[in-house]
Amino acid sequence: FERQQVAEMLWLLNAGNDDGMKEYLQNAASENRAWDGVFRDVILARGDDNDASKGAAGFYKQRIGDLDRLTNDVSVRFFGINVSCAQCHDHPEVSSWKQDHYYGMKSFFSRTFDNGGFVVEREYGFVKFKTTAGEEKHADLMFLSGEVIKEPEAPEPDNKAKEAEKKRLEQFKKDKKPVPAPEFSRREQLIHAGLKPGADGFFSRAIINRLWYRFLGYGLVMPLDQLHGANRPSHPELMEWLARDLVSHEYNLRRTIRGLVLSAAYARGSQWGDSQRPSASYFAVAQPRPLTPNQYGSALIFASIDPENFRPHTIP
């Protein structure tokens, strides 16, 4: 179970073959670390050599140089919302998604950068964008729910202060140490906003939808990255109940997975009678699915490997 869970989480987070991320997720699966804890570790990315969250910074490695990709990936993978359509204009089909939402999410990462392999955050920096009318705006620090987070004044430093900051960062880089987090961290504010009760439940519903898709072959909301009011779940009461249950049991994914695989919906066969096969969204019959590339490759490795060399908590 743990091996497969790590593989699925690597796919979900699109972490590729980053060794640090693999090790982090292996430990998280072994300890049954809560999903909100994984979210915190990944977003903060502050683990050092003696920290259990070491390796979680791997999520940023392929993204830290591209804030637009980082913004949308966090939104898609943790909140089930693809906000990229609201980058250049308000969403054409979802009236609730505005440019303010996209750039509000981007603002959580606008002060984040790499310093000697460490993911660090400075105390200043704002996001500007132009509306379709040509108006230039400063983006508010705004979560997907529309909540605007108040923050202390953070004026742009003068050239002398920037030069001093540059020297300070170089020293941390030479010492191979992380830069201390700012007193007001925008990434910390994202965690608070995302996990806040009543924040439209994006965080809990997104992982429930992905787990349902993983085991049942079709999400309660499809596509998986379109979890918004204009795209209602096929079974809204079930979605809300599962999300509440997950939160009330401290984001214990193993417990939720156990419930799903013991359910009547999961146990259904894939054969149907002579009548028309029902839509996949009814979950009245199992959906035949090919193996994923990862499953197929893993199966070949498992079938051919020497059992004596098969070690627990290792992904070939």
How would you describe each model-predicted region?
Residues 1-313:
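Primarily short, surface-exposed interaction patches in extracytoplasmic proteins
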